[in-house]
C-alpha cells in the first residue's frame, strides 16, 4: 500500500509500469479519466496537480475559465486489472490552478471538507461509512428515445418471466421467483462464479472485501460486501466497487446497472449506508440509551431524520430513485428509526455487546448517488443534529408496513419525487454550508443541473405506459 508520492514513483519503477491512469469523479458521480506515460508524473504532480480542460465535465467550469488540475492521492494507487498494458490507477481531487485552492464543485474535495468539519467541531475525529450497493446483472439491455418512440427492454437468463421460453439447449428452469432471489444456491444462482471473480478483483484493487450473495429480486440482483472505512476512503472504495463490477460483468458478456428500479413489480436496488463517529480511538455511538445508543448517537439520528427530505437530493438523486421508494418492496418510505427493524429508514443493527460495532444504517440511499456528496451530506446532517440536540422522537418498533393509514399519517415520509427532494434542499441547506463544506454556489448549481438535465427533460417526454392508459381516450 503506497502512502506518499515517493512510494508511488518507486512502485512505477519497480513494477516497470508504463501508463498512469488518473481518475476523478464528475458532478453526477461518474468516474472520468486520462492516461499518461509514466515519465509525466513526478513529485510536483502530487502537490500542484496535472492540468486538464474542465469545461466539458458535467456541471463544472465554463469554457472561458476551464483550466483545472487533477491532484492524485498517493494512498489510492492500484494496478488496473482490466488494462492490457500494466497501468497504475490513482484517484484524484481537483484544484483551481490559478488560486491553488481545492475546487468548490469537486465532489471529492467536498467530502474532505466534511471530514475536516467533523474534526474542527470537536465532536469527533473519525467518521466511518459502510455502503451496501445492490445491482442487477442483465444479459441484454436495449433502450431508445426519439420523437416517435420510447422504450426499454432488459432481459436476464434468471428472469422469472423467462420460465416458459425456448432456450438454446432447452430451458433448464431454476429461475428465481419474484422476491424469492435471496440466498439460493446454484443452479438457481447462476452468478456465483462471476461474483467471486468480482470480489477477488476488488481485493486486487485494494478494497477490503467481505462477502457476496444473490439478492431478493428475480432477474439477476446481487450484492458484494466490503469493509467499512473512513468517509473519504469508503467513497473511493465504492467508486472502485462499481468500476470492478461493471468490467468483470463485461468480461462475461453481461452488463450491470446500479439503477434503483430497472424492473417493475420486484424489489429495487438500494445502497444502505452504515455510519458511526469515533474520537481518539473510542466509539461515540455506544451508550445507555435506546438500543445501547449514546445520547450523541440519538441526536445524530435526529439530524438525519430532520434533514432527510433535503438529504435525498444527494442520496437518491435520480428520477428513478423514487420508483424504488414505494411501499411493498422492502424500501423505507417513512422517516423513523428502530432497532433491527428494516422497514424503518434508520435502522440500528443488532450488534451485541460490542461498543465498536454500534452504528446506524440509513436505508434510503441508492447507488445513483455520488458517494462523496451523499456521505458528506449525511455527516453534515448528523453534526447538525448533535450541535442542536435534535430529538429523533420515539423509536418505531413495529413493522411500518402493517400500520393503518391513520397511524402512517403521523409519520413523516420521504419525498415522492426528485423534484420534491430538490425543493426540500432549496429550503433546507444551512446544515450543509455550515463549516464551509458545501457552498451556496454548489447547491444552486446542483439543483439547476438536476432540473435542467433530468427532471425537466423527463417531463417533456410521453411515457410508454401512458399509451396503455390513454390512447383510446
From Swiss-Prot:
The keyword Transferase does not apply. It catalyses: L-glutamate + NH4(+) + ATP = L-glutamine + ADP + phosphate + H(+). It is an enzyme of class 6 (ligase). Mg(2+) 1 binds at residues 132, 272, 361. Residues 107-473 form the GS catalytic domain. Residues 15-100 form the GS beta-grasp domain. The keyword Metal-binding applies. The activity of this enzyme could be controlled by adenylation under conditions of abundant glutamine. Its EC number is 6.3.1.2. L-glutamate binds at residues 267-268, 324, 330, 342, 363. It comes from the Bacteria. Disulfide bonds: none annotated. Oligomer of 12 subunits arranged in the form of two hexagons. Involved in nitrogen metabolism via ammonium assimilation. Catalyzes the ATP-dependent biosynthesis of glutamine from glutamate and ammonia. This is Glutamine synthetase. It comes from Picosynechococcus sp. (strain ATCC 27264 / PCC 7002 / PR-6).
